[in-house]
Amino acid sequence: MEPVPGLSVRVFDTGWMEITRPDSADRLLCDEMGTAMWIALCQESWRLGDAVASLSRTWEADPWSIRDQMCDWIADLTDAGVLQH
């Protein structure tokens, strides 16, 4: 998995994140959780398991729960044309 080429990603002071594609005027807004998941994936070279482990330590949360949430979120981003496999 990786982002499609040419994305523009902007993180706001509120913790929300805006993702835009070069071929569309649409924008995708992510809340603080989505922003944290995006950053974790970037830091872990888009390896889901490593990003889950990092977030579960940071949030002191069940890694399986985080993995489920991330998989749902990744599916949404893939459907939106932001991520590719």
For each of these PLM feature ranges, what is it?
Residues 29-85:
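Long, charge-rich, low-complexity alpha-helical segments
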Residues 1-35, 39:
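Acidic, low-complexity/disordered tracts enriched in E/D and polar residues
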